[in-house]
Amino acid sequence: MDFNTVSSFQVDCFLWHIRKRFADNELGDAPFLDRLRRDQKSLRGRGSTLGLNIETATLAGKQIVEWILKEESNEALKMTIASVPSSRYLADMTLEEMSRDWFMLMPKQKVAGSLYIRMDQAIMEKNIILKANFSVIFDRLETLILLRAFTEEGAIVGEISPLPSLPGHTDEDVKNAVEVLIGGLEWNGNTVRVSENLQRFAWRSRNENGRPSLPPEQKWKVARTIGSEI
């Protein structure tokens, strides 16, 4: 097993432990708690894939971090922080909307890269809006935390979430997954809109209906893919 893969997992486990202690003292805000919950699932998936015990990895990660801090000067730390671009967290959904349980009458699901797409194909002829919580860097979507599709009544009818066992995705991965979800919902006569944040940071262009602009042949391809695969 690659040494860097193991040590990276160990450090991630220890840093998650520190963040959890911080949250336990009621010091974390909503974006912080969102990321903490998602990262916990990701670490469990990575641990299962690597065959590593999380508690043991956390202790090993502590030793690595302590060694780094012992060698790190305050001046070097300042230079490192200054050189790293900062990301922003954008939230279309409240914490309640993100954590709410939902069920599907006609469940359909699909894995697209490292993203998991779910939708209820029993939903027909509804007005639906896609909301997402994600981070942005250089005015582009960096990391999707969670995307959900809501009806006007507030019911959840679709979702895109990162797979814990396959961390890492690009803004193009998210765009492709959203197009699959939109195609599946529109297949049943629903009208789908995308939140302003998603329009701005995931797509550079949009149409008057508030959804990403797709060429006709791509719309047809997406719809056909949904009908046969999802």
Swiss-Prot record:
GO terms for cellular component: host cell cytoplasm; host cell nucleus. Its main location: host cell. Belongs to the influenza A viruses NS1 family. One of its GO terms (molecular function) is protein serine/threonine kinase inhibitor activity. Residues 180-215 are annotated as: CPSF4-binding. A motif (Nuclear export signal) lies at residues 137-146. GO terms for biological process: symbiont-mediated suppression of host cytoplasmic pattern recognition receptor signaling pathway via inhibition of RIG-I activity; symbiont-mediated suppression of host gene expression; symbiont-mediated suppression of host mRNA processing; symbiont-mediated suppression of host PKR/eIFalpha signaling; symbiont-mediated suppression of host type I interferon-mediated signaling pathway. Disulfide bonds: none annotated. Residues 1-73 are annotated as: RNA-binding and homodimerization. SUPFAM superfamilies: Ns1 effector domain-like, S15/NS1 RNA-binding domain. The keyword Ligase does not apply. Keywords: Eukaryotic host gene expression shutoff by virus, Host cytoplasm, Host gene expression shutoff by virus, Host mRNA suppression by virus, Host nucleus, Host-virus interaction, Inhibition of host innate immune response by virus, Inhibition of host interferon signaling pathway by virus, Inhibition of host PKR by virus, Inhibition of host pre-mRNA processing by virus, Inhibition of host RIG-I by virus, Inhibition of host RLR pathway by virus, Interferon antiviral system evasion, RNA-binding, Ubl conjugation, Viral immunoevasion. The dsRNA-binding region is required for suppression of RNA silencing. It is found in: Host nucleus; Host cytoplasm. A motif (Nuclear localization signal) lies at residues 34-38. Inhibits post-transcriptional processing of cellular pre-mRNA, by binding and inhibiting two cellular proteins that are required for the 3'-end processing of cellular pre-mRNAs: the 30 kDa cleavage and polyadenylation specificity factor/CPSF4 and the poly(A)-binding protein 2/PABPN1. In turn, unprocessed 3' end pre-mRNAs accumulate in the host nucleus and are no longer exported to the cytoplasm. Cellular protein synthesis is thereby shut off very early after virus infection. Upon interferon induction, ISGylated via host HERC5; this results in the impairment of NS1 interaction with RNA targets due to its inability to form homodimers and to interact with host EIF2AK2/PKR. InterPro entries: NS1, NS1A, NS1A_effect_dom-like_sf, uS15_NS1_RNA-bd_sf. The keyword Mitochondrion does not apply. It holds the Pfam family Flu_NS1. Residues 223-230 are annotated as: PABPN1-binding. It comes from Influenza A virus (strain A/Swine/Wisconsin/1/1961 H1N1). This is Non-structural protein 1. Homodimer. Interacts with host TRIM25 (via coiled coil); this interaction specifically inhibits TRIM25 multimerization and TRIM25-mediated RIGI CARD ubiquitination. Interacts with human EIF2AK2/PKR, CPSF4, IVNS1ABP and PABPN1.
